[in-house]
Amino acid sequence: LLAGSGSAAVTAYRIDPSAPAAFVAHALRADGRILVAACPPQGTPLAIAPDDVAVDIRLDITLDAAEPGVRITAATAHLLGSLTWVEGEDRALLLASSRASACHCAIVGEDPLERVREIAAGSGGRLGVITCERVMLHCVSGVSSHDIEEILDIDSADAAAAPSASWSPQAIMDAHEAVSAVGQLG
């Protein structure tokens, strides 16, 4: 989810917890920081937050199932962190030097950094960097908490010792097609 799939929303909860969340494009950098790009509406906390000043935020990412007839939330990720908007030469340097933790989104196959670049370059677009320590994940396997270092170290011995119960995107699509082929019950 952090790599760029799903729908992400950022809330500046300390500035105005009642303000609506801003939807953002996101990508996980190889160094564990999360790049976000948004076009926050004028007057909202994220629009008025100054550049180069860390703002406490909540990032919520929701992944819906690939069933067009029913809205089913397949997984969500939540984190509290600090968002710093980047402008000028720093912005260009950050985009040029960024490498995602995965070259393409495992769900849709897109390069998440490309979407971040497009939105940041648009009218009213802002580019930000989120730093955090922990991520909460809600999925079919239950609720779990992960350090960002743990997420980045997917090739560690611990990761190999405890295989994930998650399905690959291809396995999910195969299962969806098999269920759809059965037709409606009843």
What are these regions (language model features)?
Residues 29, 60, 131:
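Short beta-strand segments
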Residues 40-110:
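Short, structured beta-strand-loop surface elements
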Residues 1-5, 45-48, 74, 125, ...:
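Anion-coordinating catalytic cores for phosphoryl-, nucleotidyl-, and glycosidic chemistry
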Residues 33-38, 79, 84, 128-130, ...:
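Short hydrophobic-aromatic micro-motifs
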